[in-house]
Amino acid sequence: MQFKWATGTNNQVYQDALSIRRKVFIEEQHVDETIEIDGTDNTKHHVVGYLDNIPQATARINPLDQDTLKIQRVAVHQTQRGLGLGRQLMNEIENWARTNNFKRLILSAQDPVIPFYERANYLISNPEGYFEAGIPHHDMEKVLH
């Protein structure tokens, strides 16, 4: 899988990321579009994974401070799940974080995919959990070494 990065919304990478997010979150999971497209994409980094130049996986990256990176909107196209693309995407993000001297990654995981993140050594940081867009979530984190 080939990865492309961009910042903001005036680029093809963002448009490709948005197409995956619309399919996964709005169409599949029925997340309200005003929640998914929250008006903050223009200040975030976006990464998209391509297979044969077709966008298949994406995430939104939000540096919170000099040490902490928040990973958001992680999505893999429905037809490509279970093939390791999500793992490749997370590896790409972790490599980018290390290159840019981030020490800690945090994310809000939908409960059904917590095992995916646990396999990548993320730990639940709030045992009580919460609902976001009607979907149960838990915060998770990983310290980079």
Please name every model-derived segment:
Residues 21, 117-118, 122:
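Conserved active-site tyrosine of GNAT-family acetyltransferases
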Residues 48, 54-63, 67-75:
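Conserved beta-strand in the GNAT
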Residues 108, 123-139:
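Conserved catalytic-core motifs of GNAT/GCN5-like acyltransferases
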